[in-house]
Amino acid sequence: MISCHSFTMTPSAPNSTVLPSATPVCPQSSACRWRGLIETYRPYLPVSDQTPVVTLLEGNTPLIPAPAIAKRIGKDVRVFVKYDGLNPTGSFKDRGMTMAISKAKEAGAKAVICASTGNTSAAAAAYARRAGLRAFVIIPDGYVALGKLGQALIYGAEVIAIDGNFDDALTTVRQLSEHYPVTLVNSVNPYRLEGQKTAAFEIVDVLGQAPDWLCIPVGNAGNITAYWMGFCQYKELGKGDRLPRMMGFQAAGSAPFIQGQPISHPETLATAIRIGNPANWDKAWAASRESNGEFHPVTDAEILEAYRILAAEEGVFCEPASAASVAGLLKQKDQVPAGATVVCVLTGNGLKDPDCAVQNSGNQVKAGLKPDLEIVAKAMGF
């Protein structure tokens, strides 16, 4: 029996109105102009008329059919990928950051801070600068993809690299936010999860129902927590009559949920989920337990294979950590019920880590050819 005991609807903020039905203000299927997550799902978020909405029109990302992956599973299974790499800064973090920064500005904050493996720093910097706030970012030195670091820098974040891992960085920013006038915007900030839960709303709005399985990469465990919050809230409002199994997948070298305890030295090429001590530990376990879900490990080799399949067979270019959801689905395909609908969450854009694509594509540039018709045609196989 699947239930939502640990996740209740967010109380309405003062001066906000809860609609009697679960119909969003501006559903994906409508022809109206997209206005960003807060305006679209305002009745279901802890905002009021006094909340200054800071938005880059995030959300409304596509739910893309994945027939090549479905064919590998068989059994008349339908597979979709929720491609959050098409958010403004290229990852799902924008969903949470529109809420976190809007509420920080409402509270009078002048600066925000986060620890990051890359995506959080990009989103925090973009939304903070749009709001006119300073953005401080603490990163683990040498463990952030250049595409993500470049984003944070060009947005104007004040970046500090520490000799340590993400967990060390998170401990540092938590301490700083307790002693200095900076607002913490990592996923321990509850407004982050409120924003991120809207991805579940969008999936139900498109499918008309929750999927049977929701496959998701797990790092700091905020996203699996947020999706479960969203599915539970929508069901309580009468939007659909079922809940998905939450299937969380971790890199084998960075898998505290599989080991059942935090780990000190996580290692994986999927840097976005290279986290040994997830901040949302208890909530993620609750989401898994209440949904009859599971956590499973996937190796770096399995992640890279799924990464290549998504690009070469589905035309979807995601960052390596995102592909953990598809790697996990393929690894657990014998468990998938016949006729099931499965959604795999792709958390970030492949352009976040172009070096990984170049190094692992299995493809090569045929360089040094003369601009001669016959020579080029021969290189093309004609």
Curated annotation (Swiss-Prot):
Highest rank taxon of the organism: Bacteria
GO biological process: cysteine biosynthetic process; threonine biosynthetic process
EC category: lyase
Pathway note: Amino-acid biosynthesis; L-threonine biosynthesis; L-threonine from L-aspartate: step 5/5
Residues annotated to bind pyridoxal 5'-phosphate: 119, 219-223, 347
Cofactors required: pyridoxal 5'-phosphate
Enzyme Commission code(s) on record: 4.2.3.1
Modified residues (N6-(pyridoxal phosphate)lysine): 93
Keywords assigned by UniProt, alphabetized: Amino-acid biosynthesis, Lyase, Pyridoxal phosphate, Threonine biosynthesis
GO molecular function: pyridoxal phosphate binding; threonine synthase activity
The keyword Lyase appears for this protein: yes
Catalytic activity, reaction form: O-phospho-L-homoserine + H2O = L-threonine + phosphate
Record GO cellular component, one term: cytoplasm
Similarity comment: family membership: Belongs to the threonine synthase family.
Role, per record: Catalyzes the gamma-elimination of phosphate from L-phosphohomoserine and the beta-addition of water to produce L-threonine.
Protein name (Swiss-Prot/TrEMBL): Threonine synthase
Organism of origin: Synechocystis sp. (strain ATCC 27184 / PCC 6803 / Kazusa)
